[in-house]
Structure formats: C-alpha cells, structure tokens
A protein has these predicted regions:
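Conserved PLP-enzyme active-site core in the AAT-like
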Residues: 2-27, 54-57, 62-66, 73-264, ...
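A glycine-/small-polar-enriched, mobile loop at the entrance of the PLP active site in fold-type I
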Residues: 14-52
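Charged, low-complexity, helix-prone segments enriched in Lys/Glu/Asp/Gln
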Residues: 39-40, 47, 91-94, 271-278
Length: 320
C-alpha cells in the first residue's frame, strides 16, 4: 500500500498521547495552512507583521500586547532574558553574560520539571540563575516570601509552570503566587505552553504568559507570548541578541494569527461531544473484551483543560 508513511519510509503513528512534540505535535489546521501558503509568495516587513499579530492576538487573549516566537521554549528563554535587560541594548548585546544584572529567577522547586528538555536549562540559556524555593513535594507561601526577602535585590522575575508534568506538586496556587510577586514588585512569567484557557492568566494579572501555537491550536511550529506592552516590547528586542537564533519565519507568524482565531471560533460543545464519543467507544470496547490483567479509568485533565483521557493499566505479570 503506497501510503504517506510507506512512501517516505516513516514508521506509522497512531496517536494516543495528545499533542506531543515527539510525534509532530498536531495535525495542522486548514486556516493555518492557507495563511502560510499565502504569505510564502510575498516579502513582508517582519516588524509590521509582528505588530499586526500583536493587535489581533491580544484581542483574544484579553491582554495589552503579544508576539510570535520560534516556540514556547524559545519564548521562555527570551522572556527571562528581557527581565534582566529591560530595553537596554548594551545589556541585550551582552547576554548570556549577566554580570552586574539582576539575574535570579524565582521558581518553586517542583516546577523545575522536564517537558522533553529541562525548564532549568531554558532559564539558564539566557544567562539567568535559578533561585528555587520550597521542598521536594511542596512549597508554601511563607517559604516564597522568605526567599524573596533574602534575595530581593538580585531577583529579576518569577516563573510559574502550568503543566501536567508538575500537577502532583503541592505548589503555591497561581493567583496567590502572582499576588505575592506583585506585592514585592517582581514581574511574573507563566509557562503555560499546552494550556487552552489562555486569557485566564491575564485575568490573574500575570505580566507575561507563554503558549504553544502548534499544540492544541494546530498551527505551524511557533510560540505565542502575551502580556503587558512594556514587557512584550522588551522580549521582542531580544531578537537583536540571543533571540536571533530563535527567530520565527513570516509563515509561522501569519499562520499563528489564523490558527488562534480559528481556535477561539471553534464549536467547543461539538468538540467535547466528539471526544466523549471516542472515550465511550473505547470504554465499551474494553468492557466487552474483558481483557485479563488490564484495567482502565477516565482521568480528567490535571490542569483544567476541557479534555478527559482514558488511562489503561496493564499488569505485566498477567498480560504480556
């Protein structure tokens, strides 16, 4: 059979994981494909295109400004870099050398997770230093405040990671984290790469939040950063320094605009019904087959996305 996989000598993939980078993230949506195909044939002023993206995307995110970068991971590094440099070009050119800069990033220990690469490394690529707080399983508000009090003059920003990778960690709740940072005049960066409810973080008064364009939105590979205008401008300036190696093409910028707009205009009720039909099909399948050594249950998304998963448990002492 001459399928895409056999023709290109690729291993066929049946995706039961979700939007994972390792398997190509997602199936690209039609609007993003059309947008990319249109702009491929034109020269454009990238600054102007990013300005248009900012206006159109920030309207949906309900925040002041936005920009497109190469990926959410790139956005993490650039956002941290901007908190150390501000709009000072001499500092931007100097990175990753952060001598004489406020270069510490406050983060709860359980948020130093690995999503395929380490959050720690994404932060340190900018030249910043990790200031972790809390214990192995828990972090408290008092621990955060104590850490801030002892290190305040060296803290450039604070990062909060929203991900199923660290959902079991007893972290300080995000609204309390942001409120505490505001009280101490520390800007907040939210790493929410795979989270659907994007505008939620700006309702909580986050200064910057980072999302993936090519996961649940199904756009081309890119990261979307939203937030307060002064911070977004400083992040964009990183393209004159370490951000140059993380630059994003015109096609990904244009596609992200249309991908996000399509996402917000989708029929959510229909989408949830379709997901539930698939879950019910597989539940019925396992109930009817009654496999020995296999159990299963539906697991709600741990960070609040509107999806459920069917988790399969295999007893390898019984089932081979």
């Amino acid at each position: 059979m001459n399928t895409f996989y056999t023709k290109n000598k690729l291993t066929p993939i049946i995706n039961v994981s979700g939007f994972m980078t390792k398997i190509g993230a997602s199936i690209t949506n039609s609007e993003s494909i059309k947008a990319a195909n249109k702009i491929f044939n034109y020269f454009v002023n990238i600054d102007e295109l990013q300005s248009i993206a900012s206006k159109r995307i920030s309207k949906y995110l309900k925040t002041e400004a936005a920009l497109i970068t190469a990926s959410a991971a790139a956005g993490l590094t650039e956002s941290v870099a901007s908190m150390m440099t501000g709009n000072d070009l001499s500092k931007i050119y100097k990175l990753p050398n952060t001598n004489k800069m406020k270069n510490k990033v406050l983060i709860q220990r359980g948020h130093l997770t690995n999503y395929g690469a380490e959050v720690r490394q994404g932060i340190e690529l900018s030249g910043a230093k990790i200031l972790s707080c809390g214990q192995k399983k828990i972090c408290t508000l008092k621990e955060l405040q104590d850490t801030i009090s002892k290190n305040k003059k060296n803290i450039s920003c604070a990062m909060y990671v929203v991900s199923h990778h660290c959902s079991d960690y007893n972290a300080v709740e995000i609204s309390k984290f942001i409120k505490l940072c505001k009280k101490n005049n520390i800007p907040t960066i939210i790493d929410a790469a795979s989270e659907e409810y994007m505008e939620h973080f700006f309702k909580l008064d986050a200064d910057v939040a980072i999302f993936s364009a090519h996961k649940f939105m199904g756009s081309l590979t890119a990261g979307i950063i939203g937030g307060k205008k002064k911070y977004i401008k400083n992040i964009y300036l990183q393209n004159l320094g370490i951000g140059r190696g993380m630059k994003v093409g015109k096609e990904a910028i244009f596609a992200a605009i249309f991908g996000l707009e399509k996402w917000y205009k989708r029929d959510l009720k229909k989408e949830i019904n379709n997901q539930n039909k698939i879950l019910k099909y597989w539940l019925k399948f396992f109930e009817n087959e009654n496999f020995n050594g296999i159990s299963y249950k539906i697991i709600p998304d741990p960070t609040g996305n509107k999806i459920n998963r069917l988790r399969i448990y295999i007893n390898n002492k019984i089932t081979k």
